[in-house]
Amino acid sequence: MEKINLVWLKRDLRLTDHAPLQAALTSGRPTLLLYLFEPMLLGDAHYSERHWRFVWQSLQAINRDLAQSKGEVLIVTSDWQTCFARIAERYAIEAIYSHQEVGLACTFQRDLALAQWCQQHDIVWHEFPYAAVIRGAQTRKNWDEHWQQVMRSPCCDPDLTRANWLKLDAATLGLRSDIPATWQSKQAGMQTGGSDMAWATLEDFFARRGREYYRSISSPSLARHACSRMSPYLAWGNISLREMYQTLLKHWSVAGFRRSLIALSSRLHWHCHFIQKFESECEMEFRCVNRAYDSLLQQSSDAPAAQLAAWQTGHTGIPLVDACMRCLIQTGYLNFRMRAMLVSVLTHHMNVDWRAGVTYLAQLFLDFEPGIHYPQFQMQAGVTGTNTIRIYNPTKQAQEHDSEGQFIHKWVPELAQVPVPLLFEPWLMTPLEAQMYQVPLESPYLKPVMDLEASAKQARDRLWQWQKLPAVQAEAMRILARHVRQAKPRTSPRQPNKRQPEMD
């Protein structure tokens, strides 16, 4: 049988800075590019149609770029066992090339099974690191230096002109390749996948949008324009983190951009930091990273189904909370501060275990990245024992970051006639005012699902009491030893600690 290479695309849907593809093409053997829509992931609670639409769009962009070199990605709906076995019936798979995936437990178990299958079939599986993430790292010793070295190294750009492509179709293998029609049509308000869209978005940021980045990052309205908007393209690998970082460095001296680029550079570093954290302790998909909190969370309430549904659909009666959730449902995007607020409302004000909302928000975030999602969710829920407890006040957030009410008015049309500042606390309206501003007396905005002031006090008392417990503090020391680099001696006693930035 003819010997071939197989390049398995997963969350690296691009043709540039792609070490697995570069290595496969260098070997000279016929190379098959493969993407699997795995039933295991299609049915996983973290994913929804918006993710697979974005993946489909990304694959179509790759195939457009491959047309000139007469290549094509084989796109199949199948589990890996069936697909690889069908290919192995026709060809001798000499080697499989892919990026390491810092993913959910189900993908890790899949990879363990694949490694065993490769060993049984005498197939070499070449896995390449994701960005600067170190597989199995137990400490952060020299991690920052490693990050800089990786990010400043030359990109691994495959020479597609010399590619020896192997083209197969799913029918030949007796496999499915049908794609739902809903994946093939764009959804209004949702970003479109593909490397071409990634680069266009990045270039637009450096050309004009990015000047206001550092001052607009907290506003749910302004952030939609001024933030990089690169998160889904990084999450699905339409562009590599290194490509984005090196492009940022090229613009470092552009007038008017320095403060924004310093802020963005910091966030690219934190991007890898959180994924490394998940890689080093992936059990946090199921338990609190600070294990002492698991028994404490048994005291959390099971929110009434109606209350949880109100949070999920954006009908809590808290204007900014509802506006944010409805925006997220419609567009797949929300700036970091508002995401944190949604988690705080669920876990603090409603006193619900973070696990009750973690997969739901994953379904909504177009940029869902397991390695960022779980550490961030737990940090905002206040169950790490190492981070500052942040209990968000939605009214205060609205007053500060939507001061004219534009965002709320757009996403909560029920309050279109309500003026500022009453818009931020509509439950203070008198019946006469409600009638004047066309708010029905049965509206949740006159009687929200929670009392923000009372619930915040209860959460504050609860969380601070927990954080002082010896078991929580002991776990916190373990977490710091594993996930945080040792601080260098301060040159001045007044030098401040680094604060974690907002991540958008």
From Swiss-Prot:
The keyword DNA-binding does not apply. Belongs to the DNA photolyase class-1 family. One of its GO terms (molecular function) is DNA binding. Signal peptide: none annotated. This is Cryptochrome-like protein cry2. It comes from Vibrio cholerae serotype O1 (strain ATCC 39315 / El Tor Inaba N16961). InterPro entries: Crypto/Photolyase_FAD-like_sf, Crypto/Photolyase_N_sf, Cryptochr/Photolyase_FAD-bd, Cryptochrome/DNA_photolyase_1, DNA_photolyase_1_CS_C, DNA_photolyase_N, Rossmann-like_a/b/a_fold. Residues 483-504 are annotated as: Disordered. The gene is cry2. It comes from the Bacteria. Keywords: Chromophore, FAD, Flavoprotein. Binds 1 FAD per subunit. Binds 1 5,10-methylenetetrahydrofolate (MTHF) non-covalently per subunit. The occupancy is 0.2. Binds the FAD cofactor more tightly than the MTHF cofactor. The keyword Transmembrane helix does not apply. GO terms for biological process: nucleobase-containing compound metabolic process; response to light stimulus; response to stress.
